[in-house]
Amino acid sequence: MDAKQVLVMAATMLTAMGAPVFAQHAREPYVRVAEIEIDPAQLGAYTAAVKEQIEAAIRLETGVLALYSVADKDNPAHILVFEMYADTDAYKAHLETAHFKKYKVATQDMVKSLKLRETIPILLGSKSR
């Protein structure tokens, strides 16, 4: 499975949310995808840091609707993070949180490359597990 297939799966597997979620016309969520290449020697430490950051963001931030971090099966050092926020203000607020800043400092020397992709929601759906 290549990175694009992983991304498509992540976008369609919005299962962490309790009820169906659909993009609203008046206020669509802000959705982006981060493509991150990690130093393979530091992959374990990176995985721990991203898990801690995502768990804190989901628990503490009402504007964070979904965060999914997945690794490419053929290249585990290639990470994709699907991010969905209530709106751009929620995203900006997320960037200022202590847990996000801690993650950025902790991982700055682990990240070999970072590409942020802006997206346009077409249809976002999920169901309970």
Mark where each language-model region is.
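An amphipathic, aromatic/His-enriched active-site/gating alpha helix that lines ligand/cofactor pockets
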Residues: 6-7, 25, 52-66, 84-118
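Intrinsically disordered, low-complexity acidic/polar segments
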Residues: 43-45, 78, 90, 125
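Glycine-rich beta-strand-turn "strand-cap" elements at beta-sheet edges
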Residues: 2-7, 13-31, 68-77, 104-129
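N-terminal targeting signals for Sec/Tat export/insertion, comprising classic cleavable signal peptides
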Residues: 30-60
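Short, well-ordered beta-strand segments in beta-rich or mixed alpha/beta enzyme
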Residues: 29-37, 66-95
